């Protein structure tokens, strides 16, 4: 004859400048990565119980008046008041102060029934309420003993017992929901129902799991404290009932049909060896042996007034073994739960049993959506870990915002994450705190929640960048520039004090690798020319964080103040972007140009031909007219005989009325051609590109000299060259 057992390893302003052709990005501030998120790991509180008592198997934060308590279950602890009882278990009330004290809660006369190994403290729950409601503590292996005269022997029926404590943690009232005077047979009906292996309290309901009902088919027992009536929920799907399903292994309640109704949850992790959850709908896991339904949590993830559902499958196996999963179901209304397209997996670590426990933490990060904690108590060779997930408008983030282990707390803990509790603000800073049990090290830890700072940032840019308008001067040169204004607004629900923000502004994020950056920050002392890429938008990015802020006012007389954290918005990590465009004066979306090119050869003495040896220089005057929309990135290609070599652009031809030379840059050349980049934007105007070419005969070879505007570059010297013939040319360069 077996019993169900839960034990064991199972604001600022910045100016950026655009020179008519320049680019450089400068990082302003080094941003440090954010530390641990909502839960503070530096000032954790640890509580220890008797050795080998499994102290921490269940935990519960509780508050009554001005007093905050950590209630801890130690299901195999010995009783100091009844030394003859073997390992009955105990409930400890720990005062959360600088000097913690433990008190053992008395369970009353009912303990006089056989309480050996009853596992008092296997489950704990609290009635909701700001000032703390009743507490329920259960011992699912408590046995009802009766003597059969007919058989001449005692019979022990593991009915299970729960104790309901007042909010001052006194005057326990026993509840034995499975006791029946006529019950005599172990396993049959409620003879071994093991009530209380799990429990959950609402304002009016006491919900207890009884997985041993009817040969471990299981049931969920609901006691209405207002009417005094008891209801029993079995699996009413007659075709699906199977012995050993363990319905009631986990229980809960939520608002699934409507915000004004309460529906009860019951998990059956052994249903067909796959697992099942049954509120007003049925969820069945297809993974064999996953223990789907061994933990359940009803929580309104998307803040729509209806409860969504998280179901743990801690023995689900992925690549290795028993990594564990949590299934997510989003309420579509009227208890129509749609499973999300992903599962929560933690670190997907070997034998972690992620999903063993799930707890609703309330809104830790002030974004309006509840957050949850998931325990993986066997991760890292039974050391354990706890993962924090944040609720979102669409449901829940699939990635945890925080991972907490015993080592990150500086403590040697084992089975950390076996139990979780929240719902109470122990330090009066306006945020609910979290308790975590680690029963293999007989410990429990309380983690306080850090206050949240909400920062809204914006980047203001001009709508367009007009290259014709030079609003700034750089090195006494008119320069095209734009102002980038970064603004921050800061708000906190609880924190009061100065906030030290640091931010990093990056420009031109979308620049193409084949082009240089187009912008630089004022004062760099670096300039370029020829901005060629004017089609790609100019994108700016601001990432920000806060320096560690010293808090001067404690949140209570007992606890040191906690440093605030920045709220992490969904979709990005404190990063915003904005972009602007280069202005294009086009009548249509796609510019329609009308480029007309003419060229005239200017020979010495106005001759019609040029005889080799009759002179050293000839000129080619090119005229380019655009009578349509603005042309962007125009290029001019000139080809000439091999014995003529390009020298430079003459500046004397640039004052001919309205004729304007925007800029000329050689970006490629061959022995018989040059390729000029005229300008990034060629508007409705003429361009004269005058190119003198001087044949310089040097022992039948040529001196090759390439000149573009005022930039001179000696490209190559063919064989041996007589430089005397090039002296005049070199002098005027």
What are these regions (language model features)?
Residues 3-687, 696-700, 704-710, 716, ...:
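Conserved beta-strand/short-helix segments
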């Amino acid at each position: 004859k077996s019993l169900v057992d839960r034990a064991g390893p199972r604001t600022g302003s910045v100016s950026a400048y655009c020179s008519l052709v320049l680019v450089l990005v400068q990082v302003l501030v080094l941003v440090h990565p954010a530390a641990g998120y909502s839960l503070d790991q530096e000032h954790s509180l640890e509580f220890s119980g008797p050795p080998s008592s499994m102290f921490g198997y269940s935990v519960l934060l509780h508050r009554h008046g001005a007093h905050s308590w950590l209630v801890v279950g130690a299901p195999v602890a010995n009783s100091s008041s009844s030394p003859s009882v073997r390992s009955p278990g105990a409930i400890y009330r720990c005062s959360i102060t600088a000097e913690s004290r433990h008190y053992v809660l008395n369970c009353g006369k009912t303990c006089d029934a056989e309480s050996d190994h009853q596992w008092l403290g296997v489950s704990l729950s609290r009635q909701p309420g700001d000032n703390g409601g009743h507490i329920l503590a259960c011992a699912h292996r408590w046995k009802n003993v009766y003597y059969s005269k007919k058989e001449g022997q005692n019979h022990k029926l593991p009915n299970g017992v729960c104790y309901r404590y007042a909010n001052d943690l006194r005057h326990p009232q026993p509840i034995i929901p499975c006791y029946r005077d006529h019950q005599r047979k172990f396993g049959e009906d409620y003879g071994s129902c093991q009530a209380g292996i799990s429990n959950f309290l609402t304002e009016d309901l006491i919900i207890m799991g009884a997985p041993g009902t009817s040969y471990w088919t299981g049931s969920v027992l609901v006691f209405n404290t207002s009417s005094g009536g008891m209801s029993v929920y079995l699996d009413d799907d007659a075709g699906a009932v199977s012995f050993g399903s363990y319905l009631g292994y986990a229980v809960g309640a939520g608002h699934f049909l409507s915000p004004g109704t309460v529906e009860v949850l019951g998990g059956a992790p052994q249903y067909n060896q796959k697992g099942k959850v049954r509120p007003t709908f049925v969820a069945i896991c297809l993974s064999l042996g996953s223990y789907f339904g061994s933990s359940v949590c009803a929580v309104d993830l998307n803040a729509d007034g209806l409860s969504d559902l998280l179901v743990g499958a801690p023995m689900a196996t992925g690549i290795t073994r028993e990594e564990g999963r949590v299934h997510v179901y989003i309420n579509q209304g009227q208890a129509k739960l749609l499973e999300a397209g992903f599962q929560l997996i933690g670190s997907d670590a070997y034998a972690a049993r992620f999903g063993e426990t799930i707890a609703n933490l309330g809104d830790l990060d002030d974004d309006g959506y509840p957050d949850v904690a998931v325990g993986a108590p066997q991760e890292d060779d039974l050391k354990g870990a706890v993962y924090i997930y944040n609720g979102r408008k669409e449901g829940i983030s699939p990635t945890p915002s925080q991972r907490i282990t015993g080592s990150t707390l500086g403590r040697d803990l084992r089975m950390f994450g076996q139990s979780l509790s929240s719902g109470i603000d122990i330090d009066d800073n306006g945020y609910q705190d979290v308790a975590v049990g680690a029963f293999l090290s007989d410990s429990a830890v309380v983690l306080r929640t850090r206050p949240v700072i909400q920062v809204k940032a914006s980047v203001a840019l001009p709508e367009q960048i007009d290259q014709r308008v030079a609003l700034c001067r750089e090195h006494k040169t008119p320069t095209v520039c734009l102002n980038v204004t970064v603004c921050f607004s800061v708000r906190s629900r609880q924190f009061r004090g100065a906030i030290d923000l640091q931010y990093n502004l990056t420009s031109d994020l979308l620049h193409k690798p084949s082009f240089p950056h187009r912008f630089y920050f004022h004062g760099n002392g670096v300039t370029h020319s020829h901005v060629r890429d004017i089609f790609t938008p100019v994108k700016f990015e601001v990432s920000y964080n806060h320096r560690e802020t010293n808090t001067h006012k404690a949140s209570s007389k007992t606890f040191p103040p906690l440093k605030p954290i920045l709220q992490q918005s969904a979709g990005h990590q404190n990063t915003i972007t904005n972009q602007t465009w280069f202005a294009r004066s086009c009548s249509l979306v796609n510019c329609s140009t009308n480029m007309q090119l003419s060229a005239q050869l200017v020979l010495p003495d106005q001759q019609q031909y040029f005889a080799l040896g009759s002179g050293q220089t000839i000129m080619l005057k090119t005229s380019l007219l655009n009578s349509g929309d603005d042309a962007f990135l125009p290029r001019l290609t000139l080809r000439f005989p091999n014995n003529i070599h390009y020298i430079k652009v003459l500046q004397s031809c640039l004052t001919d009325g309205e004729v304007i030379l925007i800029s000329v840059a050689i970006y490629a050349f061959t022995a018989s051609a040059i390729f000029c980049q005229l300008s990034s934007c060629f508007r409705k105007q003429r361009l004269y590109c005058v190119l003198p070419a001087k044949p310089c005969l040097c022992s039948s070879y040529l001196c090759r000299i390439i000149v573009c505007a005022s930039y001179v570059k000696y490209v190559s010297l063919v064989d041996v060259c007589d430089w005397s013939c090039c002296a005049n040319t070199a002098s005027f360069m």
